[in-house]
C-alpha cells in the first residue's frame, strides 16, 4: 500500500491522479490533498478519499474548508500556507508525492519531497526549469525517485534503456543520438500569422487535443510549454540542448521518441489522456489499469510530423536561449512568462505581446549563477517585478 500526497489535487492532473487512485484502492491510500482556493472541490475529494490532511492557501479558505468537513463528519486535519505544503510533501506517513501545483509555487514543496527521499511524480515542470541543478542534486543526495508525468517526458522515460538511471553513463554511452520531443502545435498551428495579435483568451485555451488548465493551455498555444519541456528534458535525462529536437505532431498520438546511434527510433504511442503517464509513474516498474482505452491505429490512419516555425512560436526559441545561457536565465524566463500569461488571461495584453514581454525581461535581467533556493526565489521575484513594470 502506497500513501500518496497530491499537491494540487483540484487541478486537471490532480483529478486524473485521483481517478487512478480510485481504480486501485488496494494499492493506494491518500495521505494529503492540497488546493489553493477551490474549497468546495477539495471538500468533495476529502469526502471520497478521506485524507489525513488537507491544505489550502489561506486562513480564510481553511476556515471555510473546516466548516464543510465538520458538516460531513470528517476527521481530516486542515492546514494552510506554503509551509504546510512542504510539511505534507515530506511527511514520514507519505511514500509518494504527486507534484502538480502549477508554476513557481510548486518549487518549494517539490524540493522538500526530494530532500525527504520521496518518490516524486513530477508534473510541475517549473521546478526543474527554475532550479534544475538544485532539484537533481537533492534527488541524488537523498535517494529520492523522480518519475516524469508530462506525457512527453514519461514517453522518453519509457523509450530509454532500462538501465539509464541506474548507471553513471552519458547519453552517448547509452547509444542515444537525440531526443525527439513531440508537440501538437496547439490551436494556432495553421492560423494566419498576421491574425495572431487578434487571438482571444477563449481561443487560446481551447486546445485541440488535451484537456488542461488555463495557464498551460496558453503556454501550449505559444509553445512556451514545449520550451519548458526542453529544459525539463535536459535536466531529467542529461541530454544537451542541441540533442533535443522539437517536432510538431498534430495528432498527439506519438508522445515522444528516442533516436539511437544504430538508426533505431523508439516511440511511445497512446491516446492523449494524462491518466496513462500517471498510472505508469505510480506503478513503475509494474503496469496497472489507467482507465484509458488503447489507440486504434486503423482509425487514426495517418501520423504527420513537421518542424516548428519559430516565427510563429518565438517562445520556443526563448526557452532554448535560456537553457543555453544557464544559471538564473530559465527562472527569469519562467517568471516573466507567468506574469505575461496572466496579463493575457486578464485582458491586459494581447497574445503576441506575451513573447515580446518575456524577451524584454530576459534582456533586462542577465543570467547569474544559481547556488541555492533563495537565489532562485530572488531571481524569480525580480523577474516578476520587472515584467509587471513593463505592462
Curated annotation (Swiss-Prot):
Protein name per the record: 1-deoxy-D-xylulose 5-phosphate reductoisomerase
NCBIfam families per UniProt: Dxr, PRK05447.1-1, PRK12464.1
Residues bound to Mn(2+): 150, 152, 229
Function: Catalyzes the NADPH-dependent rearrangement and reduction of 1-deoxy-D-xylulose-5-phosphate (DXP) to 2-C-methyl-D-erythritol 4-phosphate (MEP).
Cofactor requirement: Mg(2+); Mn(2+)
Paired cysteines (S-S): none
EC number of this enzyme: 1.1.1.267
InterPro entries associated with the record: DXP_reductoisomerase, DXP_reductoisomerase_C, DXP_reductoisomerase_N, DXPR_C, DXPR_C_sf, NAD(P)-bd_dom_sf
Annotated pathway: Isoprenoid biosynthesis; isopentenyl diphosphate biosynthesis via DXP pathway; isopentenyl diphosphate from 1-deoxy-D-xylulose 5-phosphate: step 1/6
Single annotated GO MF: 1-deoxy-D-xylulose-5-phosphate reductoisomerase activity
Residues binding NADPH: 10-13, 124, 126, 213
GO biological process: isopentenyl diphosphate biosynthetic process, methylerythritol 4-phosphate pathway involved in terpenoid biosynthetic process
Protein residues bound to 1-deoxy-D-xylulose 5-phosphate: 125, 151-152, 184, 207, 220, 225-226, 229
Pfam families in alphabetical order: DXP_redisom_C, DXP_reductoisom, DXPR_C
Keywords: Isoprene biosynthesis, Manganese, Metal-binding, NADP, Oxidoreductase
Annotated family: Belongs to the DXR family.
Recorded superkingdom: Bacteria
Catalyzed reactions per annotation: 2-C-methyl-D-erythritol 4-phosphate + NADP(+) = 1-deoxy-D-xylulose 5-phosphate + NADPH + H(+)
Amino acid at each position: 500500500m502506497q500513501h500518496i500526497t497530491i499537491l494540487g489535487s483540484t487541478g486537471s492532473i490532480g483529478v486524473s491522479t485521483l481517478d487512478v487512485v480510485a481504480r486501485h484502492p488496494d494499492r493506494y491510500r491518500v495521505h494529503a490533498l492540497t488546493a489553493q482556493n477551490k474549497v468546495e472541490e477539495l471538500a468533495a475529494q476529502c469526502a471520497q478519499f478521506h485524507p489525513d490532511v488537507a491544505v489550502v492557501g489561506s486562513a480564510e479558505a481553511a476556515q471555510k474548508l473546516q466548516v464543510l468537513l465538520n458538516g460531513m463528519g470528517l476527521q481530516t486535519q486542515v492546514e494552510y500556507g506554503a509551509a504546510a505544503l512542504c510539511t505534507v510533501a515530506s511527511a514520514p506517513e507519505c511514500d509518494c508525492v504527486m507534484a502538480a501545483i502549477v508554476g513557481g509555487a510548486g518549487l518549494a514543496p517539490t524540493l522538500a519531497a526530494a530532500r525527504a527521499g520521496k518518490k516524486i511524480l513530477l508534473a510541475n515542470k517549473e521546478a526543474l526549469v527554475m532550479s534544475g541543478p538544485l532539484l537533481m542534486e537533492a534527488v541524488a543526495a537523498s535517494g529520492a525517485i523522480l518519475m516524469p508525468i508530462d506525457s512527453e517526458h514519461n514517453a522518453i522515460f519509457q523509450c530509454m534503456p532500462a538501465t539509464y538511471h541506474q548507471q553513471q553513463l552519458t547519453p552517448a554511452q547509452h547509444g542515444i543520438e537525440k531526443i525527439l520531443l513531440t508537440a501538437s502545435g496547439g490551436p494556432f498551428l495553421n492560423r494566419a500569422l498576421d491574425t495572431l495579435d487578434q487571438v482571444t483568451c477563449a481561443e487560446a485555451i481551447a486546445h485541440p487535443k488535451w484537456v488542461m488548465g488555463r495557464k498551460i493551455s496558453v503556454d501550449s498555444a505559444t509553445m512556451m510549454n514545449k520550451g519548458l519541456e526542453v529544459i525539463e528534458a535536459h535536466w531529467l535525462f542529461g541530454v544537451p540542448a542541441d540533442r533535443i529536437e522539437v517536432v510538431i505532431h498534430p495528432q498527439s498520438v506519438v508522445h515522444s521518441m528516442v533516436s539511437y546511434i544504430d538508426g533505431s527510433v523508439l516511440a511511445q504511442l497512446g491516446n492523449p489522456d494524462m491518466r496513462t503517464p500517471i498510472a505508469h509513474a505510480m506503478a513503475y516498474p509494474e503496469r496497472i489499469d489507467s482507465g484509458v482505452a488503447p489507440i486504434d491505429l486503423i482509425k487514426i490512419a495517418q501520423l504527420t510530423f513537421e518542424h516548428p516555425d519559430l516565427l510563429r512560436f518565438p517562445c520556443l526559441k526563448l526557452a532554448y536561449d535560456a537553457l543555453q545561457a544557464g544559471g538564473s536565465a530559465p527562472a527569469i524566463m519562467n517568471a516573466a512568462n507567468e506574469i505575461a500569461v496572466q496579463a493575457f488571461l486578464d485582458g491586459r495584453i494581447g497574445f503576441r505581446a506575451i513573447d515580446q514581454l518575456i524577451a524584454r525581461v530576459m534582456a533586462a535581467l542577465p543570467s547569474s549563477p544559481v547556488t541555492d533556493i533563495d537565489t532562485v526565489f530572488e531571481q524569480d521575484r525580480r523577474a516578476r517585478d520587472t515584467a509587471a513594470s513593463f505592462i
